[in-house]
Amino acid sequence: QYGHPFDTESVVGSFVPAMETIPYLTREPDGFSYAMDPQDILYGLGENIRGINKRGWVYESKCSDDPNHTENKSSLYGAYNFMIVSGKATFGFFIDYPGKVTFDCGYTDLDTLRVTVAEENYDLYIIEGESPTDIVHQFRQLVGAATSRPKGPLVLPRAAGAS
């Protein structure tokens, strides 16, 4: 826990956020970093641009209402501050924070994952597991059951005035 986090009500149950000593990650004044090996893969950040491996790009976790989802964007409309590192070490982390979080996934420095949080008022949860699948299951226990799927993508679009 850093600063005085706003209770986003996204964590259910009695889970304890990471304190001063953080496994895997190096604490920095505005967030933290992780020294990656060449084979490390980065998963997560919810529905986002680019491929499943997030390495090599900068992502901004902030809710934006931009209808043009192109490869050169750094964020979409959702904010999913959950990431899994799979490689020399396999672990996940979740940042419970309602503001802007920037994930530099090896864009500035190919071998460094750098996470910057706009304010030091957030909870950081480290999730250890035997595999990425195990880490995802633990993450779901942390944040609870998935919400209902949106109806929009499940219906056929209709032109205005069509019957």
Descriptions of predicted regions:
Residues 1-151, 158-161:
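Catalytic and substrate-binding clefts that recognize carbohydrates or anionic sugar/phosphate headgroups
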